Amino acid sequence: MKKLVSLLLVFLLAFGLFSGCAETQLETQDTTPTANAPTTLKSLRILAIGNSFSVDAMEHLYAIAAAEGVEEIVLGNLVIGGCSLETHVAKAQSGEKAYKYRKNQIGIWEEVSTEATFLEGLQDEPWDIITMQQASPVSGLANKYQPYLDQLITFVQDNKTNPDAKFYWHMTWAYQQDSTHSGFANYANRQQTMYLGIVNALQQEVEPTDAFVGILPSGTAIQNARTSYIGDTLTRDGYHLNNLGRVIAAYTWYAVLDGQPLYKINIDSAASTALTERDKKVIVEAVNAAITEPYKVTQSIY
């Protein structure tokens, strides 16, 4: 009898241990979705009031939105190279034909005009989303934002054709550590100093305004990706983004506007052919972390 009881106890213990292991395996199994949720966006009509950094950020945005199922896409970009908030205000108020106006309606960027006024771009479409940004040399200098930011917001509010248009702030990126850009001297030629300056400027000067419904944290997504195996290699000249950097920035914009976590890179364009599977994992990680923590660098696991 004692022998039978002992055998029964051994059996029960073994079964319990096995069941426990099975439960543990189930609990720790990776349940991360392998596909993105269906897009919440039926259309995207975006105008960037920017410079060459908005060109970088929007280069692949059409391809991404189309791959995710957005049905109507119209992108516009009012560009003056190196344009600051101060200069945008001056050109907007004067009506000077100072802008390159670029537009993408079919998946190809076209230069509509090389002598456009601010109003021509602003009033060309009933834009749903309008983005603003600061020139990179002064993007991390909080004292260079006002009064120009408020003046630009007021001008756009008074002249936009869609009363329901929403404003987003484009947080740009710090220069590559070996950049030779003259504006890098504003940050003692240190990438970390520039990044922290950008964060500080946004917290001090952009967030207190009630005009912006959100931040497009391209700068933090780029900084996150720099902590991965990719390293500090995301520009083509020390400050303008290369292909991978442009994809990261564009996915940051898309993920913010879609309002859902990113799980898979679906871009279907020439840009995607240069991306490895490991690159795509870094993009997903960097973008999601930037949206969750827009003012903090998140160390990559890759």
Where do the PLM segments sit?
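Conserved catalytic region of serine esterases and O-acyltransferases that act on ester linkages
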Residues: H240, L244, A250-Y302
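Short hydrophobic segments within beta-strands
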Residues: L47-I49, L78, H170
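C-terminal motif of bacterial Sec signal peptides marking the signal peptidase cleavage site
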Residues: G16-G20
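Positively charged n-region of N-terminal signal peptides that target proteins for export
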Residues: M1-L4
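N-terminal module-boundary/linker segments of secreted carbohydrate-active enzymes
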Residues: D30-V70, A270, I283, E293-Y302
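Bacterial signal peptide processing site
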Residues: A22-T24
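Conserved SGNH/GDSL esterase-like catalytic core that processes O-acyl groups on lipids
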Residues: D56-Q146
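Alpha-helical cap/lid subdomain in secreted, periplasmic
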Residues: A116-Y239, N243
